[in-house]
Amino acid sequence: MPNRQASCLSALPHLLNLPAVPIRIPVCSPARRLTMWDRLCSYCSLLKGRATAHNYVALSHLPVARSRASLSIATAACLAVTLIMLARAVRPAETVGQHGVPKAADGSDDGPIHSIVHYVYIKENASSMLQFPFASFLAVFAAAVHLKPTRIYIHTDFNDTEIRDAGARGDRWTRAMVAHSFFKDLVWKQVEVPTYAGQNDEERISAVQHKSDFVRWEAIAPVGGIYLDWDVVPLRPLTPLLNAGFAFVGGRQYGGAAEDGSVNGTINNGAFMTKPNSAMARIVVREQYMQFTNAKWASNLHSVTSIAEHLVAIPTEALILDRTAFAPTHWFKNSADLLFLPNAGPSSPEAVSVNTTDPMELYANDVRNRRRRAGWEMDFSSTYLLHAFSMSQYLDYVNPSTILSRTSNFGIATYDMVRKMQVLGYISATGDDDDDDKPAELLPEHEPPDGE
């Protein structure tokens, strides 16, 4: 009898063209079980067509003589659907894995996160002009060297005419980015910028930073990749993180005393990476409009942090790194001064490199370099991405000559990149390239920098 039951029950989904699911048969007395079984088999026998019947029946009125069969089929279908719903309620196989841990969503693939870099450049107002200081060129150059992206996207609301004008009449580094881009796979992509959010679209999105928050997630969600703010400078390859198997990788950030801890520990929204259509990206895109409020500047940060922290419980969906990974400093003056301002006295000595892959030798060499460094020097050895907050307020100190002098922490962190620019001819051998009006035509055109 058990084999006969299993055979008939397993045939039900096939006959009804329904997905097969495990069916739990309630435990009851033998007599009652036999009665229920006989009824179910009776329904199954009604579903079987005659030997001469065709498999296909046109969607037309059935003869009166077949009304009883139609009623039986409908009744059997209702019974099967009821059994399926009961089975799914008892064992929700799609959402629960071993030991009661939810399984990962189907939206993320099994491969690494794609090395596609995304930037967002949104107008502050209707009269805004497209401009790139040396700091932006440095950030994109470092991304090209360390991350080896297959493509770099700049998502913007500037139109094609405005972009061409900037490439023709902008200052040196603007022309270098637009008209003489060193990275041949840099793509400008026009986007629509939202102006209202909230549960009923009653919240006007005024700040360009908030508009960028919406655009970045909508842009990266379908294709995946690495999102970077313009003040984020990659310091080393992200390959270990891209290949770690997680659908989303983010890092926490520091806050300041004036914020009473409301930002400290939140996910840094200016540097993260995601697979295409990851659960993180889809949920943020779905919920960011409802969660936004102008009354709380950091509402997006809190929403993103809450989503990521909940996804950590789902295997391989989210990895959250500590503060030093992406944001070792913060945007308040006491931290920004330490990062950007030059220090008096001798320059910090250059780090000595060793030609080995042995981790013990590399660690010993790192210890020797740390003992030689200046007393004011920060340790970025555990930093992948340097989110240099408040960079726009310190542009006077973000230039080739200051960086090559090795007298600031930002200069030490980016020294190797600027030296590479010298070797490739992007800046002069003396490093005297602080004049933004210097002709961009002297730069190599469409010659992407090699990796390390």
Feature map (PLM): residue ranges:
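Glycosyltransferase-associated regions of secretory-pathway enzymes
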Residues: 28, 35-212, 230-452
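N-terminal targeting leaders characterized by basic, low-complexity, disordered sequences
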Residues: 1-44
